[in-house]
Amino acid sequence: MQKCGVLEKDDKIILQSKSILSECDLCDNCLGRFFVSSTNLSSGRRLGNKIRNSINFRIATKCYICKNLFSNIDLYVKMMQNMSTEYEFSTFTVGAILKQSIIERDDKLRSRFHLRGVDGIKTDVTKELGKKFIRKTKKRIDHLLPDVTFTINFKTEQCNVKTKPVFLYGRYVKDKRGLPQKEESCRDCMGKGCIFCNNHGIVSFDGVEGKISKFLYEKFKTERVKFTWIGGEDKTSLVMGNGRPFFAKLLSPKKRNVRLAKKSNLNEIMIHDLRKIDHIPNGSIQFKSKTKMLVSTKNNLSSNKLKKLKQLTDTPIEITDSNKQYKKRIYKLKYK
């Protein structure tokens, strides 16, 4: 029997391969996967081919484990390529949904021949998809925080794409009264996104949330925006000065590399200082706001009485709004 290359000194691989192939037919991918971790090769398919040539076993007509799934891998890579053209991304990862019968046959065979420390077939399938997609697109794989996640469903022969959220920080100025900060959620889905609201979660775009959301939909080709507001105001209030800060989480964005202007006029509100951030801060966000009040009195107030307002500095106060209580503190007070 002629041995070749990496197999010359490993009779154990040869003997185990003979035992396995005498019981069931395997493709080169499934055969090589059982032993590739104990060699210096990176390709299970290549190792499987070497083993088969070494022991003169015929090529399997139908693989016992995968039922020739690997012969169709290129079709799914092409599917990934076609779907990826809609998205801007640098990194990706890929997952797979296999028929349970395939996984069970793989587990059974690995247990039967005591094959320890061997990748399962699902891992091998995703590795093969990833390697081929990298060669086609030159994108980088990232298992922790990929821009795009592909999931290949081999049961339904479909490919699903999910993108990492984009996080933004910005400020808005509102120079017209009558605009609410928040929009009402879609009544059909309660803000989760459905066909009736085009997956936006809201159906009106007349307030601050709606106007900024619509702007971000167009810029990032995103479906839905979740806001974290730094404080709030009612529809009769103005937001002046540097504006009110906010955070936005963009769900399922197709665009990521968007150039953002320093200022954007959205008709009745202005947003500025808009920029990408890594994540939205956790927990309660501390902030200070400046409020201007116009007070009218029946009687004239002397300057001595007005000076007593200074006593409110550093005094905690409670505000009740919509049956919710908020604790505030007056840091500075001016009057004229």
Put a short name on every predicted segment.
Residues 1-336:
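RNA pseudouridine synthases
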